[in-house]
UniProtKB/Swiss-Prot annotation:
Species in which this protein is naturally found: Heliobacterium modesticaldum (strain ATCC 51547 / Ice1)
InterPro entries in the record: Ribosomal_bL27, Ribosomal_bL27_CS
GO biological process, one term: translation
GO molecular-function term, one example from the UniProt record: structural constituent of ribosome
Residues excised as propeptide: 1-9
Gene: rpmA
Protein name from the UniProt record: Large ribosomal subunit protein bL27
Length: 92
């Protein structure tokens, strides 16, 4: 009877620390002004990637999908249909 003892070893060195240790910096996305909060014209309301929240009344959409207030007023988060959200600014 022939008994074989096969052992497999790594064919590449287990390199860890020199090739690890990279991560991108946080992008600081999210809601910047909450519902009912007073804002000035130009204030950023939401920073986002894609239009997860849509612009409503008196809210502008930046080239990077940032939502910002067009007038001085109060922030109001609303539903738009069944599955969409929007943010509006209403004058006080």
């Amino acid at each position: 009877m022939l008994v074989m003892n096969l052992q497999y070893f790594a064919h590449k060195k287990g390199v860890g620390s020199s090739r690890n240790g990279r991560d991108s910096e946080a992008k600081r996305l999210g809601v910047k002004r909450s519902d009912g909060q007073a804002v000035l014209s130009g204030n950023i309301l939401v920073r986002q990637r894609g239009t997860k929240i849509h612009p409503g009344n008196n809210v502008g959409l930046g080239s990077d999908d940032t939502l910002f207030a067009l007038i001085d007023g109060v922030v109001k988060f609303e539903r738009k249909g069944r599955d969409k959200k929007q943010v509006s600014v209403y004058a006080v």
